[in-house]
Amino acid sequence: MTAVRRVVQVVLDTNVVLSALVFAQGRLAPLRQAWQQGHCRPLVSTTTTAELMRALKYPKFKLSAEEQEELLADYLPYCATVRIPAKPPRTPPCRDPFDIPFLQLALVGKADHLVTGDTDLLSLAGTFACSIITAKQFLVLLAKD
């Protein structure tokens, strides 16, 4: 009998997703392949998706509306959408209020990992309900599976 492998549930912060999507040949290209191949399942909420959509419009990326749609189509279908309740769970104090939706998503979605490069979020590692790790650390974990 073959053991069923559980898909790793992961919250990816916006900058991690942007790096994987916009820089297709960059250092986070393996992360994009991981969600496309079903090695991990990104979790999203309406708030985190809205932030990603807003970030894709930043002038520095020089992406047309069509390119933005293509990048979203390369990510969102692989994600599980988590509904954050009207009374969201308490999160640890966080300096940046824009980080709170990612912490809430990790809690409500019962994520295995929150993947980020944000030093404010990384400073909560070891004190939060799920592991908070860098993209590099996450890729190492995926490679071990």
Regions inferred by a protein language model and the residue ranges of each:
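Short, well-structured N-terminal submotif of metal-dependent ribonuclease cores
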Residues: 1-44
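Hydrophobic/aromatic ligand-binding patch that stacks against planar heteroaromatic rings
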Residues: 34, 105, 124
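A secondary-structure boundary/capping signal
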Residues: 12-14, 45, 117-118, 134-135
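PIN-domain endoribonuclease scaffold, especially VapC-family toxins
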Residues: 34-89
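Residues at secondary-structure transition points
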Residues: 26, 43, 66, 93, ...
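Acidic, PIN/NYN-like endoribonuclease modules and their adjacent C-terminal/linker elements
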Residues: 92, 109-113, 119-145
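Active-site neighborhoods of divalent-metal-dependent phosphate/nucleic-acid chemistry enzymes
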Residues: 78-113
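Short, active-site-adjacent cap segments at secondary-structure transitions
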Residues: 17-18, 50-51, 121-123
